[in-house]
């Protein structure tokens, strides 16, 4: 079993914001593989199912971004999974919009949701998929991540969400190294 944890903020006001790119990828996986994310468990909305024969728990923490680690830790502890069976999906300011990047480990890179997970799990050796949202040309980063994607950005984002879902599918079925080779291009 794998846990796929998409990071974001709960509530309708954050639904289409840049900071919720992780939720969007998990929703894309759910749609593509017929998994309903309706249960409340582990301080999260969850859905259990299979992706090409691999059992998964899709997890959307409802703790707000900066406390995501508490929800992810509960799920990992409950299933007694090694961290290699967790994939965290989140937005990345340092990647251009339209790019994705898979990593097996690393620092939080300033992302507070990932920082919370690293702190709660006590390790940086956590597989992750980062969704590029780019940096604002001007203005505050905090305001930028909490703003919705523009119409033009959504045109770039939609195929990126599908690409991210495909990358996770390859990681689960053919291995993370194969997925990194196939999907970590450009950016």
Swiss-Prot record:
Reaction(s) catalysed (UniProt annotation): an N-acyl-L-alpha-aminoacyl-tRNA + H2O = an N-acyl-L-amino acid + a tRNA + H(+)
Alphabetical list of PROSITE patterns matching this protein: PEPT_TRNA_HYDROL_1
GO terms, biological process: protein quality control for misfolded or incompletely synthesized proteins; rescue of stalled ribosome
Swiss-Prot/TrEMBL site (Discriminates between blocked and unblocked aminoacyl-tRNA) positions: 9
Compartment annotation: Cytoplasm
Any Pfam family hit: Pept_tRNA_hydro
Site (Stabilizes the basic form of H active site to accept a proton): 91
Binding site for tRNA: 14, 64, 66
CDD domains: PTH
Entry keywords, A to Z: Cytoplasm, Hydrolase, RNA-binding, tRNA-binding
InterPro entries for this protein: Pept_tRNA_hydro, Pept_tRNA_hydro_CS, Pept_tRNA_hydro_sf
Active site positions, chain numbering: 19
Domain of life of the source: Bacteria
One GO location term (cellular component): cytoplasm
One term of GO molecular function: tRNA binding
EC number(s) per entry: 3.1.1.29
Subunit structure: Monomer.
Free-text function comment from the UniProt entry: Hydrolyzes ribosome-free peptidyl-tRNAs (with 1 or more amino acids incorporated), which drop off the ribosome during protein synthesis, or as a result of ribosome stalling.
Family the UniProt entry places it in: Belongs to the PTH family.
Record-linked NCBIfam families: pth (TIGR00447)
Protein name: Peptidyl-tRNA hydrolase
Organism this protein belongs to: Carboxydothermus hydrogenoformans (strain ATCC BAA-161 / DSM 6008 / Z-2901)
Chain's gene name: pth
